[in-house]
Structures are given as structure tokens and as C-alpha cells.
Regions:
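PLP-dependent class I/II
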Residues: 1-174
Length: 174
């Protein structure tokens, strides 16, 4: 925040999964001293409120920055259907609803971590979101070797009907 203030930079925080935090309290950059003036958060209704595909979100920050975003948005599109906006407002107002969704994802992830660990993967519970990436296996029984995550992913889908998303950009992960 101090760096952004010194250099007149606006921090744009991707907070799409802000309600999907596990094992610790959620911390908003806007709650930190100077955060409201130095940052804006981008929120999505998709996963946190089970509104995937509805293409609805909101921004939070200082009145100056939010007004600037609203001005751009007013000139870029015609908004979202009113019923969808009302559904989003109801979701935000009902804190129990987003907590149920968060608990649902947490249960799923804990189960997946347990199963993957049992199968020999180095899986651990993430601190947030609903994704789980694990190091890709280097090979399979019988001496089959995988050069990268893509090879491991193709083997898993073709031989075991297990669908994964390979990620080789920062190491081999599934």
C-alpha cells in the first residue's frame, strides 16, 4: 500500500473468491490503513454465490475509484438483467448462504486431498478458492515415465478416465 501511494499506483485486487477462505479469517486490502485509497477489489458472484454464468460482479474501493469504474461501465454496456441484480443482492445480504457454499467447497476439497494423499499425491488443503493443484506424477506403474504434466494428464484420462487440467508453466502440476 505504501509503495502504491508513493508511486501513485492503483492496486487492483482480484477478489473473485474472497468468501472461499479456509482456516483463517478473510482479510481485505481495503481494511488495511490506506487501502481504500490505494486499491480496488473486483468481486464475482460466480462461485461464492453459485451464480456461475450469470456474469455479475461488483467493485469495492474509494468513492473516487468506484465512480470512475461506474462511468466507464455506463459507456461500455447496458448492464445486467434486473432480476439477476436482485438475486445477487439477496445473496450478499444472506451471509449464511455464502457460508454454506464456502463450507461445501471446503468439505469437497478436504475429501479430495484425503483421496489424493492416499493415492500417493502430494496434496494439501489450499488456503482459499476451490481449485486444487498437486505436483504431477513423474510416472506410473510398469516404468512408464511422464515428461511433463500434459503427459500425466493424458495418461490419466486415456487409461483411467480421470480428467485433470495440466499446468506446466511453473512446474508440472495437475
Amino acid at each position: 500500500i505504501a509503495f502504491a501511494q508513493r508511486h501513485n499506483i492503483l492496486i487492483v485486487q482480484d477478489a473473485a473468491y474472497a468468501t472461499l477462505i479456509y482456516g483463517r479469517a478473510r482479510l481485505s486490502i481495503l481494511s488495511r490503513p490506506g487501502g481504500k485509497e490505494a486499491a480496488i477489489e473486483l468481486h464475482s458472484m460466480s462461485k461464492s454465490y453459485n451464480m456461475t454464468g450469470w456474469r455479475l460482479g461488483f467493485v469495492a474501493g474509494s468513492a473516487r475509484v468506484v465512480s470512475a469504474v461506474a462511468e466507464v461501465k455506463d459507456n461500455v454496456d447496458s448492464g445486467q438483467f434486473k432480476a439477476i441484480q436482485m438475486a445477487a443482492c439477496a445473496g450478499i445480504a444472506d451471509r449464511k448462504s455464502s457460508e454454506k457454499i464456502r463450507a461445501h467447497y471446503q468439505r469437497r476439497l478436504r475429501g479430495l486431498v484425503k483421496v489424493l494423499k492416499g493415492a500417493g499425491f502430494q496434496a494439501k488443503m489450499p488456503g482459499g478458492t476451490f481449485y486444487l493443484y498437486v505436483p504431477a506424477p513423474k510416472g506410473a506403474a510398469g516404468g512408464l515415465a511422464f515428461a511433463n504434466a500434459e503427459d500425466a494428464s493424458q495418461y490419466l484420462i486415456k487409461e483411467h478416465c480421470i480428467s485433470t487440467v495440466p499446468w506446466d508453466d511453473a512446474g508440472a502440476y495437475l
